[in-house]
Design a protein with these regions (language model features):
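N-terminal lobe/hinge region of extracytoplasmic solute-binding protein
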Residues: 58-107, 137, 199-200
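Gly/Pro-rich hinge or "lid" segments in bacterial periplasmic/extracellular proteins
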Residues: 94, 170, 176-228, 232, ...
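Aromatic- and charge-enriched surface segment that lines or borders ligand/interaction sites
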Residues: 101-143, 294-296
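Surface-exposed binding/hinge segments that line
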Residues: 104-108, 147-189
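Ligand-site clamp/hinge motif
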Residues: 192, 220-266, 393, 401-404, ...
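Detector for C-terminal structural segments
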Residues: 210, 307-337, 384-393, 414-531
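Structural transition elements
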Residues: 324-363, 385
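Ligand/substrate-recognition segments at binding pockets and active sites
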Residues: 361-431
Length: 531
């Protein structure tokens, strides 16, 4: 069974100068889309008492650690209802308060944020201004992924329940920047190295953690907000795609995350589970290591992009569940006009000409050589990108490139990046949010997402202009200019928005469809049928 729901079009990086919980609640409720009926437990005649309910989520992977500043951790904790930020983005793309109660822009470079008076860490420690500042500063210091969203902000406590945020840039969308999972609020005084020492604020507490296997959660009885009705959540790591699919089709699990498009056919005539497809503002991207000699040449990088048939890649790598794009930012609906910029069509002839100009000439064996050495490219893939990697390998081979693909665990990619022994990898980062934070986080010389070492003077100058842009139209114009210029330089190759497919059991009710599904799976609205 299939359920395809479209979220409202997302406004780019927008938030009003006043954000408050009372004023946002009504719009938020109207914006939410739910699947399988009402999410109100009192209206579910078939619901059972919370004390006996257990929800099982099958994921491709679980959090690697319990420390929110470590890689591959906070997104999973927030997705499971463990971690919270000051703000969050609802399904309509609106920024609403979470641990904050309200936010007010005092002047172009100053915000005041009032905190919820009843919010506590699991330990019972108050979520006051000093604790929030300590958390954000710890994230700034230790989490490279958080730094673009905290850059240029200075925090100070006005009162126990109020903090001031001063910004270097005028009109910085502070609530939006503080809605990202990388800014999750945690007790900075805690060690976060075990179930016993971690200290978060979410509606679910971690009670068991077995790395690479499962995380078990129970209700936080002191939660400040609406408590969930399901007593226990188990997030299991099932790396194998088919095993994960069979887990939900058999009824063993209630949610299966990151379903590969190749598995869609198994749900067509199934009455046990449904596939939810939410539009995602992210871009399936090939990151190139510019420290490798063959990839240091911009003509080679441009050839790699011109020589890709993206329509075929969507079919082979995403089962047709996406659309081709040629620039990174264009997966954000607000920048969809740039979807076909620079690389306007698949052009193998142009790719060949560029490789010829770069000195890589075809030999009788069909491969391209320069100074007696073949043009090689090693692509590392992980997760559900195996078929995509093989399709890319075939298309590049047709250009005379000796392409190889290594598919494995993400840790292999991390290790290769640490040693520098890699040519290309695939990632899909979100393109929704403040344009400067997003683009600088990818293309500034020391940015966390700048895996390949891109350092381009023109890009750096444009980023500096974007940082100082005062009005929305100027920001938009500069963002489009940076987006197109980077595509021309080709340190990365944009392919298509990564399909965001989630399978949910027909016994689960109140599931919210969200364009940022990766951090909005578990909510207090979920209920289960009696068994």
């Amino acid at each position: 069974m299939f359920i395809f729901l479209l979220c409202a079009t997302i406004a780019a990086a927008g938030c009003s100068s006043n954000v408050n919980s009372a004023g946002s609640k009504g719009n938020n409720d109207q914006a939410k889309s739910s699947v399988n009926g009402s999410s109100n437990a009192s209206e579910q005649a078939h619901s059972i008492e919370a004390g006996t309910q257990e929800l099982i989520v099958a994921g491709q992977e679980i959090a690697v650690t319990l420390d929110p500043v470590q890689p591959l951790t906070t997104a999973y904790l927030r997705n499971m209802g463990v971690a919270e930020a000051l703000f969050k983005v609802n399904a309509a793309g609106e920024v609403i308060p979470e641990l904050a109660e309200s936010a007010t822009a005092i002047d172009p470079t100053t915000w005041e944020i009032k905190l919820r008076s009843n919010a506590l860490f699991w330990s019972g420690k108050a979520v006051d201004a000093e604790a929030v500042i300590a958390s954000l500063e710890r994230s700034r210091e230790l989490d490279l992924q958080a730094q673009p969203f905290l850059e240029g902000m200075t925090f100070s406590a006005i009162k126990d329940d109020t903090l001031k945020v001063e910004t270097e840039r005028e009109h910085l969308p502070v609530p939006l920047n503080l809605s990202y999972y990388q800014t999750a609020i945690h007790n900075a005084e805690a060690k976060h190295d075990s179930v016993e020492t971690m200290d978060m604020t979410g509606m679910y507490k971690v009670v068991q953690f077995v790395p690479k296997q499962k995380i078990v959660l129970s209700i936080n009885e002191n939660y400040w907000g609406e408590k969930p009705s399901i007593a226990t959540v188990v997030h299991e790591e099932i790396a194998d795609e088919q095993t994960r699919v069979m887990s939900i089709l058999s009824g063993r699990s209630h949610i299966a995350l990151n379903v590969n498009p190749s598995s869609l056919a198994q749900f067509e005539h199934n009455d046990k589970a449904a596939i939810i497809a939410a539009p995602a503002a992210n871009t399936q991207t090939i990151y190139l290591n510019l420290n490798q000699s063959q990839l240091a040449d911009v003509k080679v990088r441009q050839a790699l992009s011109w020589g890709l048939d993206r329509e075929e890649l969507v079919v082979l790598g995403a089962e047709g569940q996406s659309v081709p794009i040629t620039t990174w930012l264009s997966s954000n609906p607000a920048y969809a006009e740039a979807a076909n910029a620079v690389y306007t069509k698949f052009d193998a002839d142009k790719a060949g000409e560029l490789l010829d100009e770069a000195g890589w000439l075809k030999d009788s064996d069909g491969l391209r050589y320069k100074d007696g050495n073949p043009l090689t490219l090693r692509l590392m893939t992980w997760g559900g990108d195996k078929a995509l990697g093989e399709a890319l390998q075939n298309q590049w081979n047709n250009l005379g490139i000796k392409a190889e693909v290594q598919h494995g665990d993400y840790s292999l990619i991390e290790t290769a990046r640490e040693t520098g022994d890699w040519d290309a990898t695939i990632e899909a980062w979100s393109t929704f949010g403040d344009e400067y934070a997003l683009l600088s986080g990818q293309y500034a010389p020391e940015a966390r997402g700048n895996f390949g070492g891109f350092n381009d003077e023109a890009t750096n100058q444009l980023l500096a202009q974007l940082a100082g842009a005062a009005d929305a139209e100027a920001k938009r114009k500069l963002a489009l200019q940076i987006n197109e210029h980077v595509a021309e330089q080709a340190p990365v190759i944009s392919l298509f928005p990564r399909p965001q497919l989630t399978a949910i059991s027909q016994s689960l009710h109140g599931f919210e469809v969200h364009f940022r599904q990766f951090e909005n799976t578990i909510t207090s609205r979920l209920t289960l049928d009696a068994q």
